[in-house]
């Protein structure tokens, strides 16, 4: 059983704000593992179907980071939460070529997907653990 008191109030508020804006939001990865083990997570990561630009619009105290693999850091005075958009595992076009931008850079890491696609593209470790906070 997960002790809700060990979940960051800030992470909960981010997920609730995503939900209010009609987006999904889940705790993901190591923080879920720690919670399942009864430990206090060191940090919290969130996965969502909102694009980085949509996350940035919702949270004024945030910044988009990364060129190849875009993420959003949402922060307050004491915490920084990393918010990642669900990604698709698809990195090929229908004819089998890698998807590239106009400059020739491979853009497979920024192809948005859904929860199922995001789960399948992650390695089968703690990175594929998702926790819904719908009842918190």
What do these predicted regions represent?
Residues 1-134:
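Catalytic cores of the polymerase beta-like nucleotidyltransferase superfamily
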């Amino acid at each position: 059983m997960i002790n809700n008191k060990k979940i960051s109030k800030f992470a909960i508020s981010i997920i609730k704000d995503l939900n209010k804006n009609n987006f999904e939001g889940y705790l993901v990865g190591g923080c879920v593992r720690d919670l399942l083990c009864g430990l206090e997570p060191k940090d919290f990561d969130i996965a969502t179907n909102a694009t980085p630009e949509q996350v940035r619009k919702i949270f004024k105290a945030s910044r988009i980071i990364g060129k190849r693999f875009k993420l959003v850091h949402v922060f307050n005075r004491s915490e920084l939460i990393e918010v990642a958009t669900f990604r698709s595992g698809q990195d090929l076009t229908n004819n089998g070529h890698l998807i590239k931008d106009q400059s020739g850079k491979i853009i497979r890491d920024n192809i948005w997907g859904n929860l199922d696609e995001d789960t399948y593209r992650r390695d089968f470790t703690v990175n594929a653990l998702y926790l819904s906070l719908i009842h918190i």
